Swiss-Prot record:
This is Uncharacterized 9.3 kDa protein. InterPro entries: DUF5439 (IPR020113). The lineage of its organism: Viruses, Varidnaviria, Bamfordvirae, Nucleocytoviricota, Pokkesviricetes. It comes from the Viruses. It comes from Vaccinia virus (strain Copenhagen) (VACV). It holds the Pfam family DUF5439.
Length: 75
């Protein structure tokens, strides 16, 4: 199943724009895999891009809102 990453990007775009320009290209792409645990979300955009987020504040189906990102891994 494909998940849309636009909700995530709406929240985090301004924070990561200056930190990692490469993530901008993923703004309107589909996420390959979305792993939602109790307080942790892993977004797999493709084999080269994985975003890990902790401190998930709200989850509902495929939408989630996060307060703080501990790590962004871009391979």
């Amino acid at each position: 199943m494909k998940y849309d990453v636009i909700v995530y990007w709406y929240i985090w775009k301004e924070i990561y724009q200056s930190r990692n320009k490469r993530l901008i290209s993923h703004r309107n792409t589909k996420v390959h895999n979305l792993i939602i645990e109790e307080h942790f979300v892993t977004i797999v955009i493709n084999i080269h891009s994985v975003i890990c987020i902790n401190e998930v504040l709200f989850k509902h189906d495929e939408m989630f809102i996060c307060w703080h990102s501990s790590e962004i891994d871009v391979w």
